[in-house]
Regions:
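Glycosyltransferase donor-sugar binding loop
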Residues: 41-45, 183, 204, 229-245, ...
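Short hydrophobic beta-strand element within catalytic cores of glycosyltransferases
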Residues: 300-304
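Short alpha-helical donor nucleotide-sugar binding micro-motif in glycosyltransferases
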Residues: 262-263, 270-275
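A conserved mid-protein helix/loop that constitutes part of the nucleotide-sugar donor-binding site
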Residues: 19, 23, 199, 203-222, ...
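Membrane-proximal helix-turn-helix segments that form the acceptor-binding/catalytic region
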Residues: 113, 126, 138-155
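A short, active-site helix/loop in glycosyltransferases that binds the activated sugar's phosphate group
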Residues: 150-175, 183-185
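Conserved acidic donor-binding segment of nucleotide-sugar-dependent glycosyltransferases
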Residues: 319-326, 333-340
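Aromatic "clamp/platform" in nucleotide-sugar-dependent glycosyltransferases that forms part
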Residues: 283
Length: 388
């Protein structure tokens, strides 16, 4: 089975989309799926892309030119490369990741030109909050090309029932496969270090207006718990880090909040393991890979009902609260009031949940079944159906 996977960026700063896409490709390859991964090369100044192992996936990064002044991306070599690969594709499909970008429109154009099945994974970019954010740009793009591109896809991939319902609300009527992201298994921990110093509440994600960090600052300002600190880890986006730092200064919490910037690899896993509670007070999340990663490391999680994590309640491994300062403050108060042993027990319940339901091998098997069905080689899999 031959699949061309397309995505605009494999840079870590692109968040969960780039990481999930490369990990899915790596997990599909051992199942007999021949993957050609196409993305853009933004140059070494933008960072090191997240690449799947070369022995599993053939990855091509095509040069692009970006004008910050005009906010325009030009990537003619990308279109030529995708066109050439699509022309030679036999019995395969295109699986595109994301929306709005030049690469997404090119994938739809090429799929139509060669009459190839197109699967689109929006990765939460069509959630209501995301659609409202910078809507002055998105509304014209939706009317001009994005709606039609999505309508011509033969199948949409949602990572949760909540995201699937959002896609239906936009009038998209083709089949939807509901397959969550998988979770990378963290490396084995070393010997536990003795606990000294303050306990830690960790936020690890893009520092972006949609992540609710200002609510976290406000909630912490109300509580001001003794013996606790907050670590904010992740890349700055749209200059939002300056706004968060300003809020921290205004609340006189400079000595409590630490900003680490982007973290990857072993440093990321160490931050998770050092945390006593993980906090993601998001306005919009189609899945929330960082929630699953924290649980995989045995850390209880606080997140909002804008993320599809009702399992935090049903499996007693965290708090699933309404968006806003007051619900967040209440959840933080409850988490801080627990003993280390009680939080550890919740974290262990979360770790079991992730290992049982979110392994990449299971996720890849479900996606392969979807590919087979789209290509007419198998019956409809259970993950494709009506939105619950």
């Amino acid at each position: 089975m031959n699949v061309i996977v397309t995505i605009s960026s494999l840079l870590p700063e692109s968040g969960g989309t780039s990481r999930a896409s490369t990990q899915l490709c790596s997990a599909l390859a051992p199942l007999g799926v021949n993957i050609e991964l196409l993305s853009l090369d933004y140059g070494s100044r933008q960072g090191t892309p997240l690449l799947p192992p070369a022995e599993l996936v053939n990855t091509r990064l095509l040069p692009c030119h970006y004008s910050r002044r005009l906010r325009l991306l030009w990537a003619p070599q990308y279109k030529r490369a995708l066109t050439a690969q699509a022309r030679e594709l036999r019995g395969g499909l295109i699986h595109d990741n994301g929306v709005w970008q030049t690469t997404n429109h090119v994938a739809a154009l090429v799929a139509r030109k060669f009459n190839l099945p197109l699967i689109v994974s929006p990765h939460g970019m069509l959630e209501p909050w995301a659609m409202r954010y910078k809507s002055w740009k998105k509304r014209p793009a939706w009317d001009f090309y994005q709606k039609r591109d999505l309508q011509t896809a033969c199948l949409l991939h949602a990572t949760s029932a909540m995201e699937a319902r959002s896609l239906r609300a936009l009038g998209l009527r083709q089949p939807i496969a509901i397959i969550p992201h998988g979770v990378e298994t963290p490396p084995p921990p070393g010997a536990p270090a003795p606990r000294h110093g303050p306990r830690t509440a960790l936020f690890l994600s893009r520092v972006h207006p949609g992540k609710g960090l200002l609510h976290l600052v406000e909630a912490w300002s109300q509580l001001r718990p003794a013996g606790w600190r907050v670590v904010i880890a992740g890349p700055d986006e749209d200059g939002h880090c300056a706004a968060v730092r300003a809020a921290v200064r205004a609340a006189q919490l400079d000595e409590v909040f630490t900003f680490t910037g982007p973290v990857e690899g072993q440093s990321k896993w160490e931050l998770y393991r050092q945390a006593d509670v993980f906090v993601l007070p998001t306005f919009s999340e189609n899945f929330g890979v960082v929630v699953a990663e924290a649980l995989a490391c045995g850390v209880p999680v606080i997140t909002t009902k804008a993320a599809p994590w009702v399992e935090l309640q049903s499996h007693r491994c965290g708090w699933w609260v309404e968006v806003g300062t007051e619900p967040l403050a209440q959840a933080l108060h409850e988490a801080i009031a627990l003993s280390d042993a009680e939080r550890s027990e919740m974290g262990e319940a979360g770790r079991r949940l992730v290992l049982e339901r979110y392994s990449w091998s299971k996720i890849a098997a479900d996606m392969r079944a979807v590919y087979q069905w789209v290509l007419g080689r198998a019956s409809q899999p259970a993950c494709v159906g009506e939105c619950p």
